[in-house]
Protein backbone atom coordinates (compact mmCIF):
# COMPACT_ATOMS: atom_id res chain seq x y z
CA UNK A 1 0.00 0.00 0.00
CA UNK A 2 1.39 3.40 -0.93
CA UNK A 3 2.45 5.32 2.17
CA UNK A 4 0.20 8.31 1.50
CA UNK A 5 -3.06 6.39 1.03
CA UNK A 6 -3.84 6.30 4.75
CA UNK A 7 -4.68 10.01 4.66
CA UNK A 8 -7.77 9.39 2.57
CA UNK A 9 -9.08 6.13 4.06
CA UNK A 10 -12.03 7.09 6.23
CA UNK A 11 -12.61 3.53 7.44
CA UNK A 12 -9.41 3.91 9.41
CA UNK A 13 -10.80 6.58 11.77
CA UNK A 14 -11.19 5.34 15.36
CA UNK A 15 -12.40 8.65 16.88
CA UNK A 16 -15.34 9.99 14.88
CA UNK A 17 -16.72 12.46 17.40
CA UNK A 18 -20.26 12.98 18.65
CA UNK A 19 -23.03 12.98 16.00
CA UNK A 20 -25.30 15.25 18.11
CA UNK A 21 -22.66 17.66 19.29
CA UNK A 22 -23.21 20.73 21.44
CA UNK A 23 -20.07 22.28 22.95
CA UNK A 24 -21.82 24.19 25.74
CA UNK A 25 -22.95 21.25 27.94
CA UNK A 26 -19.59 19.54 27.29
CA UNK A 27 -17.76 22.65 28.51
CA UNK A 28 -20.01 22.76 31.58
CA UNK A 29 -19.32 19.08 32.33
CA UNK A 30 -15.58 19.76 32.20
CA UNK A 31 -15.91 22.83 34.41
CA UNK A 32 -17.84 20.87 37.06
CA UNK A 33 -15.31 18.01 36.81
CA UNK A 34 -12.51 20.39 37.81
CA UNK A 35 -14.36 22.77 40.16
CA UNK A 36 -13.58 22.70 43.87
CA UNK A 37 -11.52 20.07 45.67
CA UNK A 38 -10.63 16.99 43.65
CA UNK A 39 -11.09 16.21 39.98
CA UNK A 40 -13.57 13.93 38.21
CA UNK A 41 -11.11 12.34 35.76
CA UNK A 42 -13.71 9.97 34.33
CA UNK A 43 -15.92 12.88 33.24
CA UNK A 44 -12.92 14.43 31.46
CA UNK A 45 -12.19 11.11 29.72
CA UNK A 46 -15.84 10.64 28.69
CA UNK A 47 -16.00 14.05 27.04
CA UNK A 48 -12.59 14.53 25.44
CA UNK A 49 -11.86 11.02 24.14
CA UNK A 50 -15.28 10.75 22.50
CA UNK A 51 -15.14 14.02 20.56
CA UNK A 52 -13.26 14.79 17.36
CA UNK A 53 -10.42 17.29 17.44
CA UNK A 54 -12.58 19.92 15.73
CA UNK A 55 -15.25 19.39 18.41
CA UNK A 56 -12.64 19.73 21.18
CA UNK A 57 -11.63 23.12 19.76
CA UNK A 58 -15.26 24.25 19.98
CA UNK A 59 -15.49 22.98 23.56
CA UNK A 60 -12.39 25.04 24.44
CA UNK A 61 -14.01 28.17 22.94
CA UNK A 62 -17.25 27.54 24.85
CA UNK A 63 -15.28 26.93 28.08
CA UNK A 64 -13.54 30.30 27.67
CA UNK A 65 -16.81 32.09 26.82
CA UNK A 66 -18.77 30.57 29.72
CA UNK A 67 -16.16 30.53 32.48
CA UNK A 68 -13.46 32.98 31.35
CA UNK A 69 -10.74 30.36 31.61
CA UNK A 70 -8.37 28.69 29.17
CA UNK A 71 -9.30 25.01 29.00
CA UNK A 72 -5.77 23.72 28.34
CA UNK A 73 -4.32 25.71 31.26
CA UNK A 74 -7.15 24.55 33.54
CA UNK A 75 -6.55 20.91 32.57
CA UNK A 76 -2.81 21.33 33.20
CA UNK A 77 -3.48 22.69 36.69
CA UNK A 78 -5.81 19.81 37.59
CA UNK A 79 -4.09 16.80 36.00
CA UNK A 80 -0.61 15.33 36.21
CA UNK A 81 1.77 12.76 34.76
CA UNK A 82 1.09 10.64 31.69
CA UNK A 83 -2.67 11.21 31.89
CA UNK A 84 -2.14 14.98 31.71
CA UNK A 85 0.24 14.55 28.77
CA UNK A 86 -2.35 12.51 26.87
CA UNK A 87 -5.28 14.85 27.55
CA UNK A 88 -3.27 17.96 26.61
CA UNK A 89 -2.17 16.21 23.38
CA UNK A 90 -5.84 15.72 22.51
CA UNK A 91 -6.52 19.42 22.92
CA UNK A 92 -4.00 20.65 20.35
CA UNK A 93 -5.13 21.01 16.72
CA UNK A 94 -3.32 18.23 14.76
CA UNK A 95 -0.68 20.34 13.01
CA UNK A 96 0.06 22.37 16.14
CA UNK A 97 0.44 19.16 18.11
CA UNK A 98 2.96 17.74 15.66
CA UNK A 99 4.80 21.08 15.56
CA UNK A 100 4.97 20.94 19.36
CA UNK A 101 6.35 17.39 19.28
CA UNK A 102 9.08 18.52 16.87
CA UNK A 103 9.87 21.59 18.96
CA UNK A 104 10.07 19.52 22.17
CA UNK A 105 12.32 16.99 20.40
CA UNK A 106 14.87 19.72 19.69
CA UNK A 107 14.70 22.05 22.68
CA UNK A 108 17.10 21.70 25.59
CA UNK A 109 20.15 19.47 25.76
CA UNK A 110 20.19 16.61 23.27
CA UNK A 111 17.88 15.87 20.37
CA UNK A 112 15.24 13.15 20.08
CA UNK A 113 16.09 12.22 16.50
CA UNK A 114 13.59 9.33 16.51
CA UNK A 115 10.63 11.70 16.95
CA UNK A 116 11.79 13.94 14.09
CA UNK A 117 12.42 10.96 11.80
CA UNK A 118 9.02 9.42 12.59
CA UNK A 119 7.06 12.59 11.80
CA UNK A 120 8.99 13.71 8.71
CA UNK A 121 9.15 10.27 7.07
CA UNK A 122 5.46 9.42 7.52
CA UNK A 123 3.63 12.63 6.57
CA UNK A 124 2.55 13.93 3.16
CA UNK A 125 3.79 17.12 1.55
CA UNK A 126 0.60 18.99 2.46
CA UNK A 127 0.78 17.79 6.05
CA UNK A 128 4.42 18.83 6.34
CA UNK A 129 3.62 22.28 4.95
CA UNK A 130 0.87 22.72 7.57
CA UNK A 131 3.21 21.53 10.34
CA UNK A 132 5.91 24.01 9.20
CA UNK A 133 3.34 26.81 9.19
CA UNK A 134 2.10 25.91 12.69
CA UNK A 135 5.69 25.66 13.94
CA UNK A 136 6.51 29.15 12.71
CA UNK A 137 3.28 30.61 14.16
CA UNK A 138 3.71 28.99 17.59
CA UNK A 139 7.47 29.25 18.07
CA UNK A 140 8.46 32.17 15.84
CA UNK A 141 11.09 30.02 14.21
CA UNK A 142 11.64 28.21 10.91
CA UNK A 143 11.43 24.42 11.27
CA UNK A 144 13.97 23.70 8.54
CA UNK A 145 16.47 26.13 10.06
CA UNK A 146 15.98 24.62 13.52
CA UNK A 147 16.56 21.11 12.17
CA UNK A 148 19.74 22.31 10.44
CA UNK A 149 20.92 23.92 13.68
CA UNK A 150 20.14 20.85 15.77
CA UNK A 151 21.45 18.05 13.52
CA UNK A 152 24.46 17.62 11.26
CA UNK A 153 25.99 15.59 8.45
CA UNK A 154 23.95 13.13 6.43
CA UNK A 155 21.19 12.99 9.07
CA UNK A 156 20.63 16.72 8.57
CA UNK A 157 20.60 16.18 4.78
CA UNK A 158 17.97 13.43 4.89
CA UNK A 159 15.73 15.30 7.36
CA UNK A 160 15.78 18.50 5.30
CA UNK A 161 15.13 16.46 2.16
CA UNK A 162 12.15 14.72 3.81
CA UNK A 163 10.79 18.05 5.06
CA UNK A 164 10.59 19.31 1.48
CA UNK A 165 8.04 16.57 0.78
CA UNK A 166 9.17 15.68 -2.73
CA UNK A 167 7.84 12.10 -2.54
CA UNK A 168 4.19 12.83 -3.22
CA UNK A 169 2.93 11.55 -6.55
CA UNK A 170 -0.69 10.49 -6.53
CA UNK A 171 -0.69 9.44 -10.21
CA UNK A 172 0.81 6.03 -9.42
CA UNK A 173 2.82 6.17 -12.66
CA UNK A 174 6.16 4.37 -12.59
CA UNK A 175 8.83 4.70 -15.27
CA UNK A 176 10.34 1.18 -15.38
CA UNK A 177 13.55 2.46 -16.95
CA UNK A 178 14.09 5.06 -14.23
CA UNK A 179 13.25 2.52 -11.51
CA UNK A 180 15.90 0.16 -12.89
CA UNK A 181 18.42 3.01 -13.15
CA UNK A 182 17.73 4.03 -9.54
CA UNK A 183 18.23 0.43 -8.39
CA UNK A 184 21.54 0.25 -10.27
CA UNK A 185 22.60 3.62 -8.82
CA UNK A 186 21.82 2.43 -5.28
CA UNK A 187 23.83 -0.74 -5.84
CA UNK A 188 26.73 1.26 -7.26
CA UNK A 189 26.54 3.66 -4.29
CA UNK A 190 26.78 0.92 -1.67
CA UNK A 191 27.25 -2.80 -2.15
CA UNK A 192 29.42 -2.45 -5.26
CA UNK A 193 32.02 -0.12 -3.75
CA UNK A 194 34.21 0.14 -0.69
CA UNK A 195 32.44 2.79 1.38
CA UNK A 196 29.04 4.35 0.69
CA UNK A 197 27.73 7.26 -1.38
CA UNK A 198 25.16 8.34 1.23
CA UNK A 199 23.85 11.25 -0.84
CA UNK A 200 22.77 8.90 -3.63
CA UNK A 201 20.71 6.89 -1.14
CA UNK A 202 19.25 10.06 0.37
CA UNK A 203 18.35 11.57 -3.02
CA UNK A 204 16.53 8.48 -4.28
CA UNK A 205 14.76 7.60 -1.01
CA UNK A 206 13.60 11.16 -0.37
CA UNK A 207 12.58 12.38 -3.82
CA UNK A 208 10.86 9.39 -5.46
CA UNK A 209 7.20 8.46 -4.99
CA UNK A 210 6.16 5.41 -2.98
CA UNK A 211 4.94 3.50 -6.04
CA UNK A 212 8.22 4.22 -7.82
CA UNK A 213 10.29 3.16 -4.80
CA UNK A 214 8.41 -0.13 -4.52
CA UNK A 215 9.56 -0.93 -8.07
CA UNK A 216 13.10 0.25 -7.25
CA UNK A 217 13.23 -2.10 -4.23
CA UNK A 218 12.15 -5.04 -6.43
CA UNK A 219 14.81 -4.28 -9.04
CA UNK A 220 17.43 -3.72 -6.35
CA UNK A 221 16.87 -7.16 -4.85
CA UNK A 222 17.41 -8.77 -8.25
CA UNK A 223 20.70 -6.91 -8.74
CA UNK A 224 22.13 -7.13 -5.21
CA UNK A 225 20.66 -10.49 -4.14
CA UNK A 226 19.65 -8.85 -0.87
CA UNK A 227 16.92 -6.48 0.27
CA UNK A 228 17.35 -2.71 0.36
CA UNK A 229 16.86 -2.94 4.15
CA UNK A 230 19.80 -5.34 4.54
CA UNK A 231 22.00 -3.08 2.43
CA UNK A 232 21.06 0.01 4.46
CA UNK A 233 21.89 -1.90 7.67
CA UNK A 234 25.31 -2.92 6.36
CA UNK A 235 26.17 0.43 4.72
CA UNK A 236 24.95 2.94 7.35
CA UNK A 237 24.51 3.16 11.11
CA UNK A 238 22.93 5.21 13.90
CA UNK A 239 20.27 7.84 13.21
CA UNK A 240 20.96 7.90 9.45
CA UNK A 241 20.28 4.16 9.28
CA UNK A 242 17.09 4.66 11.32
CA UNK A 243 15.93 7.47 9.00
CA UNK A 244 16.55 5.46 5.80
CA UNK A 245 14.88 2.33 7.19
CA UNK A 246 11.89 4.42 8.31
CA UNK A 247 11.42 5.76 4.77
CA UNK A 248 11.53 2.18 3.44
CA UNK A 249 9.06 0.94 6.09
CA UNK A 250 6.62 3.80 5.43
CA UNK A 251 6.89 3.10 1.70
CA UNK A 252 6.24 -0.62 2.01
CA UNK A 253 3.49 -0.50 4.65
CA UNK A 254 2.62 2.68 6.54
CA UNK A 255 0.20 0.95 8.89
CA UNK A 256 2.80 -1.71 9.61
CA UNK A 257 5.29 1.02 10.49
CA UNK A 258 2.96 2.61 13.03
CA UNK A 259 1.99 -0.81 14.43
CA UNK A 260 5.69 -1.49 15.00
CA UNK A 261 6.18 1.89 16.71
CA UNK A 262 3.29 1.17 19.08
CA UNK A 263 4.43 -2.40 19.79
CA UNK A 264 7.99 -1.45 20.68
CA UNK A 265 6.75 1.49 22.77
CA UNK A 266 5.20 -1.10 25.12
CA UNK A 267 7.37 -4.20 24.69
CA UNK A 268 9.77 -5.09 27.49
CA UNK A 269 10.43 -3.20 30.71
CA UNK A 270 9.06 0.33 30.84
CA UNK A 271 6.89 2.18 28.34
CA UNK A 272 7.84 4.84 25.81
CA UNK A 273 4.81 6.95 26.70
CA UNK A 274 5.70 9.79 24.33
CA UNK A 275 5.69 7.41 21.36
CA UNK A 276 2.50 5.70 22.54
CA UNK A 277 0.61 8.97 23.08
CA UNK A 278 1.84 10.65 19.89
CA UNK A 279 0.97 7.79 17.59
CA UNK A 280 -2.45 7.04 19.07
CA UNK A 281 -3.47 10.71 19.21
CA UNK A 282 -2.10 11.67 15.78
CA UNK A 283 -3.55 8.63 13.96
CA UNK A 284 -6.92 8.39 15.78
CA UNK A 285 -8.73 10.48 13.17
CA UNK A 286 -6.77 9.13 10.20
CA UNK A 287 -6.05 5.40 10.13
CA UNK A 288 -5.82 3.95 13.65
CA UNK A 289 -8.33 1.20 12.84
CA UNK A 290 -6.13 0.06 9.95
CA UNK A 291 -3.07 0.21 12.21
CA UNK A 292 -4.93 -1.95 14.77
CA UNK A 293 -5.65 -4.57 12.10
CA UNK A 294 -2.00 -4.59 11.07
CA UNK A 295 -0.90 -4.78 14.73
CA UNK A 296 -2.94 -7.94 15.29
CA UNK A 297 -1.62 -9.48 12.07
CA UNK A 298 2.00 -8.73 12.94
CA UNK A 299 2.04 -9.54 16.66
CA UNK A 300 -0.82 -11.99 17.23
CA UNK A 301 -2.44 -9.80 19.89
CA UNK A 302 -4.63 -6.72 19.85
CA UNK A 303 -3.39 -3.20 20.49
CA UNK A 304 -5.96 -2.72 23.26
CA UNK A 305 -4.89 -5.93 25.05
CA UNK A 306 -1.29 -4.70 25.10
CA UNK A 307 -2.38 -1.28 26.40
CA UNK A 308 -4.33 -3.04 29.18
CA UNK A 309 -1.22 -5.02 30.17
CA UNK A 310 1.18 -2.10 29.98
CA UNK A 311 -0.70 0.92 31.38
CA UNK A 312 -3.04 1.65 34.28
CA UNK A 313 -5.63 3.98 35.76
CA UNK A 314 -7.10 6.98 33.99
CA UNK A 315 -4.26 6.92 31.47
CA UNK A 316 -5.19 3.39 30.43
CA UNK A 317 -8.92 4.17 30.25
CA UNK A 318 -8.35 7.23 28.06
CA UNK A 319 -6.05 5.31 25.68
CA UNK A 320 -8.57 2.46 25.38
CA UNK A 321 -11.36 4.91 24.55
CA UNK A 322 -9.24 6.40 21.76
CA UNK A 323 -8.26 3.01 20.36
CA UNK A 324 -11.81 1.63 20.47
CA UNK A 325 -12.78 -2.02 20.16
CA UNK A 326 -10.33 -4.30 18.37
CA UNK A 327 -11.27 -7.74 19.63
UniProtKB/Swiss-Prot annotation:
Q: Does the keyword Membrane apply?
A: no
Q: Which Gene3D superfamilies match?
A: Annexin
Respond yes or no to whether keyword Iron is given for this record: no
User: Which key words are in the record?
Assistant: Annexin, Blood coagulation, Calcium, Calcium/phospholipid-binding, Hemostasis, Metal-binding, Repeat
Q: Please cite one Gene Ontology biological process associated with this protein.
A: endosomal transport
PROSITE patterns assigned to the protein according to its UniProt record, in alphabetical order: ANNEXIN_1 (PS00223), ANNEXIN_2 (PS51897)
Provide the residue positions that the database annotates as binding Ca(2+): 266, 268, 270, 310
GO: which molecular function terms?
Answer: calcium ion binding; calcium-dependent phospholipid binding; phosphatidylserine binding
Which InterPro entries does the entry link to?
A: Annexin, Annexin_repeat, Annexin_repeat_CS, Annexin_sf, ANX8
What Pfam families does this protein's entry cite? Annexin
Q: What role is this protein assigned?
A: This protein is an anticoagulant protein that acts as an indirect inhibitor of the thromboplastin-specific complex, which is involved in the blood coagulation cascade.
Protein family per UniProt: Belongs to the annexin family.
Instruction: Quote the record's domain comment.
Output: A pair of annexin repeats may form one binding site for calcium and phospholipid.
Protein's name according to its UniProt entry: Annexin A8
User: What organism is this sequence from?
Assistant: Bos taurus (Bovine)
Q: What is the lineage of its organism?
A: Eukaryota, Metazoa, Chordata, Craniata, Vertebrata
* Gene responsible for this protein: ANXA8
Amino acid sequence: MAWWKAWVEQEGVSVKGSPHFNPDPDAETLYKAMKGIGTNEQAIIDVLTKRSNAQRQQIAKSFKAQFGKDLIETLKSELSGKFERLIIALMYPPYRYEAKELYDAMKGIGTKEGVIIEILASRTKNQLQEIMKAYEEDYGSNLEEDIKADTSGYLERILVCLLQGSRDDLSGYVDPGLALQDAQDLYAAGEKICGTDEMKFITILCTRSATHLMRVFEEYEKIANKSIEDSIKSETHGSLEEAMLTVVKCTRNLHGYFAERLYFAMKGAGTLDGTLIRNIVSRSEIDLNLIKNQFKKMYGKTLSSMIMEDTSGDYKNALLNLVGSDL
